[in-house]
């Protein structure tokens, strides 16, 4: 067992690499910002948004997964930084047994996938809000809770599926690194994550366009128009979040897959330099509450601006009649 945890010369160089330490420090900083931004995002969603209850349930679940991921990942990063500064001479204490890392890795895979599943869940919830004739009260709570339960089950299962038959009889540099014998399955996981993220993005864009076309059909029905505006604002937010998630997930999956496929043809130093910057999951976790805050603020500002414009606009009776005629045409 002692031999397994002894670092090779390449692994020692990676531990000593300034690039590696900078990347880990940046990731650690993102975790602290994620915690603070999440508190602000939760308060804003509760007090300043017009999201349905079902949307709020899934947004909060996504925030939970983002923070849980950052907590577990930051523990791993702190261990790495400690070893870099205080244990570099202890060569046979640098690596960690894969079996010891399994609970951490399952949590990291599960929570990173959970953020993606939450986006899919939000998309399904938006379809319900769009196509169900009545979508309010207890129905929104039921839909949101049901989707959240499905997301949680899927999240718990994903981490176990990726490494379920791996003997975990080797050692790794850090717990966020996939076991060596799960290389093929990790690549499949990357591809599936990219496809799901792309699907989320495409479907949310299509749904957003559909909702905007329907808004004109109910422009003279106040309650119906408010509900449709509520649906549009929520869908626009989900679309915006899906786009950002897709960009980072594409960098993560395509970058890792490409580097793994050419690993035998490039220098270890080159591989180690780039692979740490392809690990963008911490940035997915960070940008979710950040962009959620931005969307709630910007949407609220637009609503306030429209109210001011309406209150400041003075029309004659003829102008009002002409405007009504144009709207009916």
Curated annotation (Swiss-Prot):
Q: Name one GO biological process term.
A: detection of chemical stimulus involved in sensory perception
Q: Per its record, how is this protein called by name? A: Serpentine receptor class alpha-8
Where it mainly occurs, coarsely classed, is membrane
Give the encoding gene's name. Answer: sra-8
Q: Which UniProt keywords apply?
A: Membrane, Transmembrane, Transmembrane helix
What terms describe the molecular function in GO for this protein? G protein-coupled receptor activity; olfactory receptor activity
Naming one, the record's GO cellular component terms include: membrane
**Which membrane topology describes this protein?**
Multi-pass membrane protein
> What does the UniProt entry say about where the protein is found?
Membrane
What stretches pass through the bilayer?
Answer: 26-46, 60-80, 141-161, 187-207, 231-251, 273-293
The text of the family note is: Belongs to the nematode receptor-like protein sra family.
